């Protein structure tokens, strides 16, 4: 089974077992909803944990796990990653994609390869993709209709029509 990473545990917060997460998932409010199950991976073993509280704090997601009400219960998890089953994903609408489907795709302008999507930034108005280019500076591509012409997640290929000045060097 292929597990999907949804967050990294950055630190603890306070003394009541709250964890500070760096989310790597889309829809964090659904993924970390109270009552949902996430899996903590340690040495290849995936242990289930039930979310008992969720809130946003600055750029972090703050959660507690059921039965873990003290910092001593959770401190050992700092630096570890949280995962979900692929079956936990919901169907998306047309032209909607999960981050894991976009990250790793190769981006092309016509037949010219630009690079590979390495990260997705949420900006509010639209997502922005970071494109890693070998030997060159990264490029930021807005996920808007005027730029992204087509996405083939099966082939891991994205076709764009860059706006003037979007890609330099």
From Swiss-Prot:
The keyword Chaperone applies. One of its GO terms (molecular function) is ribosome binding. Coiled coil: none annotated. It is found in: Cytoplasm. One of its GO terms (cellular component) is ribosome. One of its GO terms (biological process) is rRNA processing. Its main location: cytoplasm. PANTHER family: RIBOSOME MATURATION FACTOR RIMM (PTHR33692:SF1). The PRC barrel domain binds ribosomal protein uS19. An accessory protein needed during the final step in the assembly of 30S ribosomal subunit, possibly for assembly of the head region. Essential for efficient processing of 16S rRNA. May be needed both before and after RbfA during the maturation of 16S rRNA. It has affinity for free ribosomal 30S subunits but not for 70S ribosomes. Binds ribosomal protein uS19. Belongs to the RimM family. This is Ribosome maturation factor RimM. It comes from Exiguobacterium sibiricum (strain DSM 17290 / CCUG 55495 / CIP 109462 / JCM 13490 / 255-15). The lineage of its organism: Bacteria, Bacillati, Bacillota, Bacilli, Bacillales.
């Amino acid at each position: 089974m292929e597990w999907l990473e949804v967050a990294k545990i950055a630190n603890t917060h306070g003394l009541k077992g709250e964890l500070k997460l760096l989310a790597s998932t889309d829809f964090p409010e659904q993924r970390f909803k109270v009552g949902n199950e996430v899996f903590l991976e340690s040495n290849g073993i995936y242990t289930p944990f039930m979310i008992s509280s969720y809130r946003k704090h600055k750029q972090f997601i703050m959660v507690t796990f059921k039965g873990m009400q003290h910092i001593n219960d959770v401190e050992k998890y700092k630096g570890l990653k949280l995962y979900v089953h692929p079956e936990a994903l919901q169907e998306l609408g047309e032209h909607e994609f999960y981050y894991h489907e976009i990250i790793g795709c190769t981006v092309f302008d016509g037949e010219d390869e630009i690079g590979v999507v390495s990260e997705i930034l949420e900006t509010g108005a639209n997502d922005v993709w970071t494109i890693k280019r070998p030997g060159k500076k990264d490029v930021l591509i807005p996920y808007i209709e005027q730029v992204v012409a087509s996405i083939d997640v099966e082939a891991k290929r994205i076709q764009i029509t860059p706006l003037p000045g979007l890609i330099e060097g």
